[in-house]
């Protein structure tokens, strides 16, 4: 007797798609409306696990980490209005960082929504500002069509988040055994730009007297390091990265690499002003500054010839006119451009390359000297942590087997310089950050990264390290419960200075930029206010982690203790399916209140820190002078 086919429900359309695309997780916080879909993860034949998180912004952050590793859409399941509302911080990050996500939101019963029932609202309006497409399913019959479109659109270049609200009773309706989603349309991202426009861009680059390259996130997502390195060599051009790059957009052992753009108006202007031609490649977030005055002039001086290459029409000429605008995939298009420029390279390229090689050697010595100074300091400087991590990666032969998740926002430069983001040891996705700047992204992301064994750019996630400031870590410490529950071995490093130090630097910038300007004579009572500190009481992170997930760890107080502590933490997470926490006591920067002076510790720690960018070196003598000029090398500002 023939076996009767198992019953299928409308929720199974979701699992049809996940099986086809090889997606193995759904992230979320359980709610009654979501149970029909969550129940589908209980069936082994669906091949999907439900990852329980304790807050929706953790769920979407974890999904972002998963999507970054696989290159496929990650799926989040949220609960009516509060569910999507709780995701907004990281949804904004996902939108700015071009993350392929599909957010499924279980709406209240369709026949009831108009009557404004408990928790219901216009969900599409909540989500659509930060999604490529947002839609609420109108009938159960359109569910397979809508789901196919959602996953197609999330993957289509440039990738991004998509939102679908589904009245929850639709998911429980029985469907026929042969009612399935036929497939998901996949649009290839590998398309080349228009040949005529490529020739136009090549001609402009060949005539450049002092070219500059700005590399945005689309470079890293395209896995286009070698192609951009080739162009930098041909042009003799320094390469700066998008401020708050989501990935490593250029290898840091290439002498053309100059770190990220400054996060200030005059700082950006100083980068561009000495160059006649700027090649802006995959650069989406073009105004990552927080203080701007039109009287100070545009971020890119008007006499700079701008050439664009991007897979997003929105990002081409978004803020300023481009003399040449190539719409195409970066990895597919750059070789065509490179071949043309190679036939007619700009004058002086060889000389500029020689100068940059010398500058790279000098930069290495400066960082070695800075590390030696840091080892003699009373408290821990971030460079000591970064150097210790690099040592572990090298000694344990973890090349292409590590992912560094960065949210130590007061101290990006040491990690960006010392960790081996090189062709031999890493790939663009070996570095994880976000372009949006909404804090609290990294700890959730570490979950999704560690869940995926392999990254699509031929890397592994054997070692996942998350460096995060103490302020940022307090957004979602519930992460530690999920890490323990799912047995994820992640090394968490809290750079703990008991304050919102980045905001203190931001306050200095505001005062310097506006404090004496007509109509803006406001000045704070102190530059070091108590409300920007985290003390009285100081948070005991080890106790919090222990209580939420039984996570072990230790406090580290001096530079001499860092190397052994980092090695212990790395060994622990590699050998155990459990996370480990290092509470690193970073030098406290706040003097006794009230004060309007800058403490010596800040001067020593930051002003002696070598700039990553040696081509456009900025050398002021103190932090307030840096703020006055709007040029704080290596220190981005977030409000």
What are these regions (language model features)?
Residues 1-6, 141, 177-179, 302-408, ...:
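Phosphate/pyrophosphate-binding active-site segments
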Residues 11-14, 19-24, 29-32, 37-42, ...:
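Active-site diphosphate/adenylate-binding microenvironment
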Residues 2-345, 392, 456, 461, ...:
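N-terminal alpha/beta PP-like core and its mobile active-site loop of ThDP/TPP-dependent enzymes
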Residues 14, 151, 199-202, 227-228, ...:
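Generic recognition of flexible, low-complexity loop/linker segments
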């Amino acid at each position: 007797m023939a076996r009767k086919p198992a019953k299928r429900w409308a929720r199974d359309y979701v699992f049809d798609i996940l099986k086809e695309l090889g997606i193995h997780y759904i992230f979320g916080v359980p709610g009654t409306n979501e149970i029909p879909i969550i129940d589908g993860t209980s069936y082994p034949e669906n091949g999907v696990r439900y990852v329980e998180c304790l807050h929706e912004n953790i769920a979407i952050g974890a999904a972002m980490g998963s999507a970054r590793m696989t290159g496929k859409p990650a799926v989040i399941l949220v609960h009516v209005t509060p569910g999507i509302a709780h995701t907004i911080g990281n949804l904004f990050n996902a939108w700015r960082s071009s993350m392929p996500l599909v957010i499924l939101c279980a709406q209240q019963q369709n026949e009831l929504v108009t009557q404004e029932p408990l928790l219901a609202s216009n969900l599409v309006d909540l989500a659509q500002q930060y999604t490529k497409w947002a839609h609420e399913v109108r009938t159960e019959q359109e569910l397979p069509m809508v789901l196919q479109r959602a996953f197609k659109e999330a993957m289509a270049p440039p990738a991004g988040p998509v939102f679908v609200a589904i009245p929850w009773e639709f998911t429980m309706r029985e469907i026929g055994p042969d009612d399935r989603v036929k497939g998901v349309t996949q649009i290839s991202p590998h398309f080349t730009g228009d040949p005529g426009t490529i020739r136009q861009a090549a001609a402009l680059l060949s005539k450049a007297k002092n070219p500059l390259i700005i590399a945005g996130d689309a470079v890293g997502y395209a896995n286009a390091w070698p192609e951009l390195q080739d162009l930098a060599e041909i042009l003799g051009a320094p390469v700066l990265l998008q401020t708050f790059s989501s990935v490593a957009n250029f290898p840091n052992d290439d002498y053309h690499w100059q770190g990220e753009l400054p996060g200030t108006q005059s700082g950006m202007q100083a980068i561009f002003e000495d160059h006649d031609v700027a090649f802006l490649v995959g650069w989406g977030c073009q105004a990552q500054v927080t203080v701007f005055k039109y009287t100070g002039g545009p971020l890119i001086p008007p006499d700079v010839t701008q050439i664009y290459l991007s897979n997003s029409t929105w990002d081409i000429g978004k803020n300023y006119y481009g003399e040449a605008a190539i719409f195409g995939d970066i990895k597919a298009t750059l070789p065509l451009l490179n071949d043309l420029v190679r036939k007619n390279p700009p004058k002086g390229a060889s000389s500029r390359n020689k100068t940059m090689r010398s500058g790279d050697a000098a930069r290495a010595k400066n960082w070695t000297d800075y590390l030696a100074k840091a080892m003699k300091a009373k408290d821990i400087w971030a460079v000591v942590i970064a150097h210790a991590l690099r040592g572990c990666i090298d000694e344990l032969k973890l090349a292409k087997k590590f992912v560094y998740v960065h949210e130590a926002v007061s101290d990006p430069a040491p990690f960006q310089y010392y960790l081996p983001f090189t062709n031999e040891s890493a790939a663009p996705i070996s570095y994880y950050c976000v372009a949006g700047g909404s804090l609290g992204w990294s700890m959730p992301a570490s979950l999704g990264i560690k869940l995926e064994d392999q990254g699509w750019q031929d890397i592994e996630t054997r070692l996942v390290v998350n460096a995060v400031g103490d302020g940022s870590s307090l957004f979602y410490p519930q992460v530690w419960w999920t890490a323990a529950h799912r047995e994820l071995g992640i090394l968490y490093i809290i750079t703990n200075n008991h304050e919102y130090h980045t905001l203190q630097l931001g306050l200095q910038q505001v005062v310097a930029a506006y404090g004496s300007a007509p109509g803006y004579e406001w000045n704070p009572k102190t530059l070091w206010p108590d409300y920007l500190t985290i003390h009285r009481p100081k948070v005991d992170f080890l106790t919090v982690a222990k209580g939420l997930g039984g996570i072990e760890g230790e406090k580290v107080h001096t530079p001499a203790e860092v190397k052994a502590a980092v090695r212990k933490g790395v060994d622990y997470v590699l050998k155990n399916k459990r996370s480990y926490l290092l509470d690193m006591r970073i030098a406290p920067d706040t003097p006794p209140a009230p004060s309007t002076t800058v403490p010596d510790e800040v001067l020593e720690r930051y002003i002696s820190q070598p700039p990553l960018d040696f081509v456009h070196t900025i050398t002021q003598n103190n932090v307030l002078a840096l703020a006055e000029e709007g040029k704080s090398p290596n220190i981005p500002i977030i409000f």
